[in-house]
Design a protein with these regions (language model features):
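N-terminal glycine-rich phosphate-binding loop and ensuing alpha1 helix
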Residues: 1-57
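Flexible, charged surface loops at secondary-structure boundaries
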Residues: 19-21, 104-108, 128-135, 183-197, ...
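Glutamate identity and glutamate-enriched acidic tracts
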Residues: 16, 23, 43-46, 61-64, ...
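Conserved alpha/beta core of the MobA/IspD/sugar-nucleotide pyrophosphorylase nucleotidyltransferase superfamily
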Residues: 155-212
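Solvent-exposed, flexible loop/coil residues
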Residues: 4-7, 123-124, 208
Length: 212
């Protein structure tokens, strides 16, 4: 979705993450869109705080690059729980998994979420960097509403929250089959649910997991 010439809604979300002080950026997307998005967005973005230090001595050496990684949905999740809310969880799990393969000390203790559908200035979060890095969760608000009200506004969560998000999806997602009775009696004891009732996590909005 283009916002301006050569600037898309996804560029806006990446810029917001950079302004928030993220050390790496993880983009969740469908597997068939990874190459296109990588070609459009690239492999890194410069930290705007360091980018604007034009008058510093050797300013080119002070640049800080933030790597961008792409997280396709797992085949087992497609058409089962690949909602926008699951995308947040999937990106965080990919960040954890990749970091743990190098060192447990690299596992992030906090995550910042930015949405392509956000319609606010991405620079507003830069002045809140210290708060975003603090132990308390951070929520952008507009007219008293936050992501908990279903608004596409930036927020943070930690590893404890991530665990709660995953548990909520696991407990509330409806399976493809439901039990007819506790024990087998004569005929079948499981039946396939109607298509519109299977895998309800496909339709979970972001507020459904954040409020869990």
């Amino acid at each position: 979705m283009p916002v301006d010439d050569q600037f898309t809604a996804l560029h806006r979300a990446v810029l917001e993450c950079a302004a928030a002080g993220c050390e790496s950026i993880w983009i969740n997307c469908n597997n068939d869109k990874v190459k296109l998005i990588r070609h459009t967005i690239g492999e890194y973005v410069e930290d705007p705080v360091y980018y604007n230090r034009h008058y510093a001595k050797f300013s080119s050496e002070l640049k800080k690059y933030i790597p961008i990684f792409y997280c396709p949905n797992h085949p087992n999740d497609i058409n089962k729980r690949d909602s926008y809310s699951w995308g947040v969880i999937n990106a965080a799990m990919n960040a954890n998994r990749s970091a743990s393969k190098i060192s447990r000390h690299l596992i992030p203790n906090k995550f910042y979420v930015a949405f392509p559908f956000g319609v606010y200035n991405p620079w507003v979060v830069q002045k809140h960097r210290r708060t975003i890095r603090s132990p308390q969760n951070f929520y952008l608000s507009c007219n008293g509403k936050t992501v908990k009200d279903g608004e596409y506004l930036g927020f943070t969560f930690d590893q404890k929250d991530l665990k709660a998000f995953k548990e909520h999806i696991k407990k509330t997602n409806t399976p493809a089959y439901k039990a007819l009775s506790e024990f087998k009696s004569g005929g079948k004891w499981m039946e396939r649910q109607p298509a519109n009732e299977r895998y309800s996590a496909r339709f979970f909005t972001i507020d459904k997991i954040v409020k869990s």
